Amino acid sequence: MARIAGIDIPREKRVVISLTYIYGVGKSTAAKILEEANVSPDTRVKDLTDDELGRIRETVDAYKVEGDLRREQNLNIKRLMEISSYRGIRHRRGLPVRGQKTKNNARTRKGPVKTVANKKK
């Protein structure tokens, strides 16, 4: 397996697909990286030369991926919580942040149902 940005990418897959195993790199970003590195997207990872791998590594290093990206996202959320913005308060309470309704659903964000004891109609 080839290591790019600290991640072992699969050898048997095409390079454009293998790059998506890196956090922060999707299909379109992978295609851009390969275009900048001048590598064919249809090449298998096992068939890449050391020179091509080096060019891909240099190009990926220019992007914010893996730990740096995760750290930046966490810091952004913490900043929102510290300034007590609406979004920060929603993050703190564990509720949906982007304006979704919460009367009936939002179970993913709210967690399992907390039943109220002795509630009679």
UniProtKB/Swiss-Prot annotation:
Tell me which species this is from.
Staphylococcus carnosus (strain TM300)
- Write down the InterPro entries for this protein, in alphabetical order: Rbsml_uS13_C (IPR027437), Ribosomal_uS13 (IPR001892), Ribosomal_uS13-like_H2TH (IPR010979), Ribosomal_uS13_bac-type (IPR019980), Ribosomal_uS13_CS (IPR018269)
Residue ranges that the Swiss-Prot or TrEMBL entry lists as coiled coil: none
**Quaternary structure, from the entry:** Part of the 30S ribosomal subunit. Forms a loose heterodimer with protein S19. Forms two bridges to the 50S subunit in the 70S ribosome.
Q: Which GO terms describe its cellular component?
A: cytosol; small ribosomal subunit
The encoding gene is rpsM
Role:
Located at the top of the head of the 30S subunit, it contacts several helices of the 16S rRNA. In the 70S ribosome it contacts the 23S rRNA (bridge B1a) and protein L5 of the 50S subunit (bridge B1b), connecting the 2 subunits; these bridges are implicated in subunit movement. Contacts the tRNAs in the A and P-sites.
What highest taxon heads this organism's lineage?
Bacteria
Q: Kindly state which keywords UniProt assigns to this record, in alphabetical order.
A: Ribonucleoprotein, Ribosomal protein, RNA-binding, rRNA-binding, tRNA-binding
Region feature Disordered, mapped onto this chain: 91-121
Q: What is this protein called?
A: Small ribosomal subunit protein uS13
